[in-house]
Each structure stands twice: as structure tokens, then as C-alpha cells.
């Protein structure tokens, strides 16, 4: 089976969640093969380790793999941030997606 680079999607917290003073960022990683990825979260240029949870890759129906990573923040941390980046490393290839709070006020 050929190598396949992951598709990465990064979603900001919902306004409903922000209303409860929580903010969870969701990084979805899909369609990669082989099934091993490293996920690094960054705030600005700083690596974030607190509040991070990454699932183990699971096989999709097309025999490629998918995984997701979550970053839990408080709403105030999210709103005062300059944005967060989900950096996915797969077979030496790096894919980055960034989300900023200004996108949905």
C-alpha cells in the first residue's frame, strides 16, 4: 500500500462551548498511511503540552488511517491568544493548520 500524506482539519471551539467558559480545539487527521503520526500543538511559536489529548490512529474503511487531537483551553485563554497551530508529522512530512480566535467573534 502506498504512503499517503494526511489531510488535516483544525476546528475552533463552538460559541456554545465558549458560553460555558471552555474552549476545545479539534484537529482531525485523516487518510494517512502508514498509521503513525506525531501531533504537536503550538501557541505562537511555543509548544503546548497541557490539555492535549491525541487518539490512537484507527483504520478507515479505505484502509488508510485517521486520528484526532484535542486541545482543551479556557475561553479566556482562547480569546486572548494569537491563535493555535496543530502540527502533524507523518513519515517526515509536516502538515500545519492554524486557527485564530478572530475568525469567529
UniProtKB/Swiss-Prot annotation:
- SMART domains, from UniProt? IGc1
Instruction: Give the record's keywords alphabetically.
Output: Disulfide bond, Immunoglobulin domain
Q: Which GO terms describe its biological process?
A: immunoglobulin mediated immune response
Domain Ig-like intervals: 2-100
SUPFAM superfamilies attached to this UniProt entry: Immunoglobulin
- Give the intrachain disulfide bonds: 27-86
Q: Tell whether Disulfide bond is among the UniProt keywords.
A: yes
Give this protein's Gene Ontology molecular function annotations: antigen binding
Key word Disulfide bond present: yes
GO CC annotations, alphabetized: IgG immunoglobulin complex
Which Pfam families does the record match to this protein?
Answer: C1-set (PF07654)
Q: Check the record and name the InterPro entries matching this protein.
A: Ig-like_dom, Ig-like_dom_sf, Ig-like_fold, Ig/MHC_CS, Ig_C1-set, MHC/Immunoglobulin
Top-level division of the source organism's lineage: Eukaryota
Any extra detail in the entry? This chain was obtained from a mixture of normal immunoglobulins.
Q: What is this protein called?
A: Ig lambda chain C region
Q: Which organism is it from?
A: Sus scrofa
